[in-house]
Amino acid sequence: MAGTGHTPEEALALLKRGAEEIVPEEELLAKLKEGRPLTVKLGADPTRPDLHLGHAVVLRKMRQFQELGHKVVLIIGDFTGMIGDPSGRSKTRPPLTLEETRENAKTYVAQAGKILRQEPHLFELRYNSEWLEGLTFKEVVRLTSLMTVAQMLEREDFKKRYEAGIPISLHELLYPFAQAYDSVAIRADVEMGGTDQRFNLLVGREVQRAYGQSPQVCFLMPLLVGLDGREKMSKSLDNYIGLTEPPEAMFKKLMRVPDPLLPSYFRLLTDLEEEEIEALLKAGPVPAHRVLARLLTAAYALPQIPPRIDRAFYESLGYAWEAFGRDKEAGPEEVRRAEARYDEVAKGGIPEEIPEVTIPASELKEGRIWVARLFTLAGLTPSNAEARRLIQNRGLRLDGEVLTDPMLQVDLSRPRILQRGKDRFVRVRLSD
């Protein structure tokens, strides 16, 4: 391609890596052969303001399009956010106000900027209220006439809800048309999304055809599984790693990635070659986790991640690739500090910086407090009953010692260190 040093075929090969599906692939190649900057669209309804590594999968692929000279258009769904995308939902999503979506969007755009380049020829930010708010009812009828109710009910999430007798609001059926009209408004060549967006993106192709435009290519990326090893990464499921996590927190969470997920995390979140990934996995989960944690913690500690999170980037940090071993003098200071603290805790130590909670004197009886109540007040357990269960299973510690007595009364005349599992600590003290 002009100015990038890649032929269209080479560019396609780069873009295909990690993609789940490109619909249709031959149309993407044809568009690349036109030799012009393509308009690559991503729609985002900022129902939650914080981004995580699951979002990074799609955003990094868009960054790759930018590095090849194409323009990314990030469409903030301030209007569609008031409808609520039903994709992957088992029930109607509560709508947000226009003000709520725009407030969330500020954080969303700032965090996406850690990944996307924002030069004017490579990036454009739009709000879909620009064109959707002014649509006439006549235009809405025209849009909805392009599909049948039967076609809408073929969509997996609607189908499941319909068969289960769970209500589907009519406004939810309008969402795919609104998203499709976004593609018409900006004349999208490519629309990005996760696999759960397949239906919506295909509707975009049909609507563009109806408006006399060349249909967009649907570029679908896999959904990143979260730290629980079961569901897609989601803040609501508390199985996420945020893009703006402090280095220590990010490193710690990456070391907790379930072993079976390591291959997908390397393939979707880094640019390591396949043979390099295989070598890491063969070396074992511990060195593989360390390389993953070092790479991503270092990359996201930067104001903007590097174009490629690869072996060259790893070695530029001062780490030796071949050994995969620990070099205490290597790496940026924040990564070295995060790794050192992780190792300290893994060996049974207590981190230097831990959250602190004050306990009101009214909770004490004769200067003491029930241990289960103490852990609940500290936020380490959701209930006294759960605290008792964990103590019976030797899952809680007080000042480094394993607790065995669920009825223990704890003296709070001095600060105490509470611990749940290997890496959750709280210092508690009596309020003044």
From Swiss-Prot:
SUPFAM superfamilies: Alpha-L RNA-binding motif, Nucleotidylyl transferase. Belongs to the class-I aminoacyl-tRNA synthetase family. TyrS type 2 subfamily. It is found in: Cytoplasm. Keywords: Aminoacyl-tRNA synthetase, ATP-binding, Cytoplasm, Ligase, Nucleotide-binding, Protein biosynthesis, RNA-binding. A motif ('HIGH' region) lies at residues 46-55. Its EC number is 6.1.1.1. It catalyses: tRNA(Tyr) + L-tyrosine + ATP = L-tyrosyl-tRNA(Tyr) + AMP + diphosphate + H(+). The lineage of its organism: Bacteria, Thermotogati, Deinococcota, Deinococci, Thermales. A motif ('KMSKS' region) lies at residues 232-236. PROSITE patterns: S4. ATP binds at K235. This is Tyrosine--tRNA ligase. GO terms for cellular component: cytosol. Homodimer. Its main location: cytoplasm. Residues 369-430 form the S4 RNA-binding domain. Although this protein is a class I aminoacyl-tRNA synthetase, it displays a class II mode of tRNA recognition.
